């Protein structure tokens, strides 16, 4: 039965409709917020997927170009694979809903958010997140929701929920917060060197509104929600768990606590293999249960030892950061490079500089924009010793690249300060946790090595959380095992002054303000330590660009002179390009960017542009070229497209009968501007200069 529910959210109506669309899904809602409308449908398989050892949840976010009245590009004029924006939005929805499913669930669950209509003030991804929660909540799928998400901005020193496009342009913060009525589940966002206290206040400010949306959803679920189905999960028999614990605890402890990842992984595998062989005869029908018990025991040993003894698998203290080494300028032909190694995580970051014509055009459901700073992250299989083939960047790689880009964007110089398009690629060569934050550190040094005048160095650190028996431990610079077996992955990147980017994912049902505050403070201390290590390698941007980088000169011309520089059919600008070899980009606001690998060529092109737009002034002297001879004088081009007349009486000191007695077409002569009449005609004199020379 069709029903509509409404609440006010940030001064605008939030409407959730049920029972009208996608009625064959387990649960479906249409979320309206302003003129934004997103349909979210959730389905679940009736039976568990056989042979699966993970929870098979898939979230798809489908951007339809008709939602903003655009025609899809390409020959087929049809939406294809999801773009970067859609993938990042899908991740944003996935992360807060995933922890609230039973991790033992093996039924396929598919959440599809389809964007049907968009206005630029109301974010469809937030509607998708609320819709995902509501659609699961009213379905028969067991789940511990609801959750909700909001965006928090900071305008004129005040926090704003779901800022409009105009407010967002003035905001110094852009943080998406998701959570349940009880706790925070996910954080994703950026700021401009914000103090940790401001970031925490923004998160908690957002949570107050999240509570209201969750209560709103609970009313909907009470009224139209289906009865939840009962899922049964295989349990490891208590006897097997007890026997495995007795047999394998000591061997696993010895294997787990080793500073070297590869050796540790090998020792753990050997200990598990020995246990499996031992129990093969005792429990031949329950070997999968034995394997599950071994995995559970490994996790419990790690977590218990950290929270009760303060010892981590590699022997570090809770706040200790792995050894760091840095190197810059490794690659001779690239414009900038740096190698950042932290423990067994290593990132090679390469910077490329290009003319402004190389900006990336972003054409999705948002207004068309251009990006001049691009950060990309690659995670090849060899970095973790695996043999998977390369299939292009996946969701994780796109997410990590976006996080690193957000961390560095606030320190990138403006186009007026540095008129280059900047691309940084982070190649992860080794990974044992925190690779996205290693890419932030490596990219900072690569940018400085390239000579990009960044405003301040940026470093990143990943924090972890272990909750056990009512106690919690915050871990600095988590490694792979701590990420896999822990309860939180909390990435914080910024300068010495404050936070630029933040990302938090959890595996529990939420975390408190106290945990967040402790993690942020500990991250600040770790970030300062890492920045100090980076400064030992490179502490300021290089004074000169690489000799292989393009030399770019910028200047501004009057807007009404743009057509003069371009010329009819591009004739003038193409002439400059052919004569100098430089590349010219002319913007609508009159900014001109000249790029060339040869500095002299760029300067020559600049001089040619300046001569085109220069205004003729009375009293100024010019070297001109004779273009035409008439009975009454000679026409001389003193600037491109600017001709004046030297009357026959002004050609020489003596009387001249015919102009051709003194000059010929093509001759270059010095002339002085004596008058510009009310019709714009320019009168020139050669005689005046000859008199000046004679009288000296």
Regions found by a protein language model. Give the residues of each.
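Glycine-rich, flexible beta-strand/loop modules in the N-terminal catalytic cores of phosphate-handling
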Residues: 25-110, 115-117, 122, 188, ...
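Long, charged amphipathic helices and adjacent flexible linkers at domain junctions
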Residues: 227-238, 529-555, 603-623
């Amino acid at each position: 039965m069709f029903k509509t529910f409404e609440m006010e959210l940030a001064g605008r109506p939030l409407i959730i409709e049920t029972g009208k669309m996608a009625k064959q899904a387990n649960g479906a809602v249409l979320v309206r917020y302003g003129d934004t409308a997103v349909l979210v449908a959730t389905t679940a398989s009736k039976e568990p997927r056989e042979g699966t050892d993970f929870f098979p949840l898939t979230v798809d976010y489908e951007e339809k170009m008709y939602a903003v009245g655009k025609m899809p590009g390409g020959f087929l004029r049809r939406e294809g694979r999801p773009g970067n924006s859609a993938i990042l939005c899908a991740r944003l929805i996935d992360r807060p809903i995933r922890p609230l499913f039973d991790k033992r669930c093996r039924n396929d669950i598919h959440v599809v958010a389809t964007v049907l209509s968009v206005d630029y003030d109301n974010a469809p991804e937030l509607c998708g997140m609320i819709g995902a929660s509501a659609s699961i909540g009213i379905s028969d799928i067991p789940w511990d929701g609801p959750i909700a998400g909001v965006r928090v901005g900071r305008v004129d020193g005040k926090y704003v929920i779901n800022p409009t496009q105009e407010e967002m342009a003035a905001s110094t913060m852009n943080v998406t917060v998701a959570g349940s009525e009880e706790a925070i589940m996910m954080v994703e966002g950026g700021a401009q060197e914000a103090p940790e206290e401001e970031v925490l206040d923004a998160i908690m400010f957002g949570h107050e509104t999240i509570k209201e949306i969750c209560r709103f959803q609970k009313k909907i679920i009470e009224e139209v929600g289906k009865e939840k189905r009962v899922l049964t999960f295989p349990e490891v028999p208590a006897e097997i768990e007890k026997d495995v614990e007795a047999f394998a605890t000591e061997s696993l402890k010895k294997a787990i606590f080793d500073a070297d990842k590869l050796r540790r992984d090998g020792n753990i595998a050997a200990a598990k293999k020995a246990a499996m062989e031992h129990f093969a005869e005792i429990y031949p029908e329950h070997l999968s249960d034995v394997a599950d018990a071994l995995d559970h025991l490994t996790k419990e040993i790690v977590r218990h030892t950290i929270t009760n003894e303060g010892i981590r698998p590699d022997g570090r203290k809770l706040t200790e950061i792995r050894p760091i080494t840095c190197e810059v300028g490794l690659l001779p032909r690239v414009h900038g490079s740096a190698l950042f190694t932290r423990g067994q995580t290593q990132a090679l970051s390469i910077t490329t500089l290009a003319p402004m014509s190389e900006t990336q055009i972003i054409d999705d459901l948002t207004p068309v924009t251009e990006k001049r700073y691009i950060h990309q992250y690659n995670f090849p299989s060899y970095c973790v010793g695996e043999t998977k083939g390369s299939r292009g960047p996946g969701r994780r790689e796109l997410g990590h690249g976006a996080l690193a880009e957000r961390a560095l964007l606030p320190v990138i110089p403006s186009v007026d300060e540095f008129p280059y398009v900047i691309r940084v690629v982070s190649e992860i060569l080794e990974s044992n946790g925190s690779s996205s934050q290693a890419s932030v550190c490596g990219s900072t040094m690569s940018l400085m090595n390239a000579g990009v005048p960044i405003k301040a160095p940026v470093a990143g650190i990943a924090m972890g959380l272990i909750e056990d028996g009512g106690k919690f431990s915050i871990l600095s610079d988590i490694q792979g095992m701590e990420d896999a077996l822990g309860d939180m992955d909390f990435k914080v990147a910024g300068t010495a002054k404050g936070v630029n980017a933040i990302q938090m994912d959890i595996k529990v049902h939420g975390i408190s303000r106290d945990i967040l505050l402790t993690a942020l403070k500990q991250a600040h201390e770790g970030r300062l330590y890492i920045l100090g290590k980076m400064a030992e390698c490179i502490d300021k941007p290089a004074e000169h660009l690489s000799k292989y980088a393009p030399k770019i000169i910028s200047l501004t011309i009057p807007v009404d002179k743009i057509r003069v520089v371009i010329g009819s059919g591009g004739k003038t600008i193409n002439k400059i390009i052919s004569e100098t070899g430089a590349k010219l980009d002319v913007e609508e606001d009159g900014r001109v960017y000249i790029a060339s690998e040869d500095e002299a060529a760029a300067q020559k092109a600049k001089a040619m542009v300046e001569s085109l737009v220069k205004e003729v002034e009375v009293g100024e002297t010019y070297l001109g070229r004779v273009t035409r001879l008439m009975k009454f004088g000679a026409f001389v081009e003193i600037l491109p497209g600017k001709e004046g007349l030297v009357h026959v009486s002004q050609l020489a000191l003596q009387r001249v009968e015919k102009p051709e007695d003194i000059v010929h077409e093509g001759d270059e002569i010095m002339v002085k501007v004596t008058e510009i009449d009310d019709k714009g005609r320019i009168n020139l004199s050669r005689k005046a200069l000859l008199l000046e020379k004679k009288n000296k």
